[in-house]
């Protein structure tokens, strides 16, 4: 999410929004219906809102990126907060968070750039593919309980060439909802 460029999550462009998160595979055994987009947005927001006060602070934002292994600089955090904090109160509310993550389609080049940033978060070793271990690392950083074996099964749902890894092209299909994959946040 950060390279340390601004993550797609907080990139605001006129006419361009981030792509939707993939839906969980009902066949994966969850048994409950997939959450609505609003429920999923609130769940992701709560991951960021570590102290549960209903708003995301700069320190909570920084802590989340650090837990993902992508510590943001003070300047990057300030820029993300400035772009996200529409009312200027120094915090990101659920409404501000939702506005930044609206799922309307946007400029294809901007979406591609956002996907590349997200892919790099998962591809820790920079080899151009996402392994089960790399997926598990990111999920753990987000507070999700997933074993490497479970991540291998998730990868099988989108691994078009059968190599046990997710390439960028496979990642794009997954993020567009064209494959089955557990939610990432």
UniProtKB/Swiss-Prot annotation:
It holds the Pfam family EF-hand_7. Residues 36-71, 72-107, 110-145, 146-181 form the EF-hand domain. Residues 1-41 are annotated as: Disordered. Keywords: Calcium, Metal-binding, Repeat. Ca(2+) 4 binds at residues 159, 161, 163, 170. One of its GO terms (molecular function) is calcium ion binding. Ca(2+) 2 binds at residues 85, 87, 89, 96. The keyword Transport does not apply. Ca(2+) 3 binds at residues 123, 125, 127, 129, 134. The keyword Calcium applies. It comes from the Eukaryota. PROSITE patterns: EF_HAND_1 (PS00018), EF_HAND_2 (PS50222). InterPro entries: EF-hand-dom_pair, EF_Hand_1_Ca_BS, EF_hand_dom, EF_hand_pair_protein_CML-like. Ca(2+) 1 binds at residues 49, 51, 53, 55, 60. Coiled coil: none annotated. Potential calcium sensor. This is Probable calcium-binding protein CML10. It comes from Oryza sativa subsp. japonica.
């Amino acid at each position: 999410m950060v390279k340390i460029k601004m993550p797609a999550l907080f990139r605001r462009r006129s006419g361009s929004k981030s792509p939707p998160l993939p839906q969980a595979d009902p066949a994966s055994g969850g048994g409950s219906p997939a959450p609505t987009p609003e429920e999923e947005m609130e769940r992701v927001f709560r991951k960021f809102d570590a102290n549960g006060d209903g708003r995301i602070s700069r320190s909570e934002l920084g802590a989340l990126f650090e837990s993902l292994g992508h510590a943001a600089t003070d300047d990057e955090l300030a820029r993300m907060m400035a772009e996200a904090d529409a009312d200027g109160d120094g915090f990101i509310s659920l409404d501000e968070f939702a506005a930044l993550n609206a799922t309307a389609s946007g400029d294809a080049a901007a979406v591609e750039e956002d996907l590349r940033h997200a892919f790099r978060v998962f591809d820790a070793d920079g080899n151009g593919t996402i392994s089960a271990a790399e997926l598990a690392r990111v999920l753990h950083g987000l507070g999700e309980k997933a074993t490497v074996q479970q991540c291998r099964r998730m990868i099988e749902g989108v691994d078009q060439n059968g190599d046990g890894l997710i390439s960028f092209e496979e990642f794009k299909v997954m993020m567009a909802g064209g494959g089955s994959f557990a939610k990432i946040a």
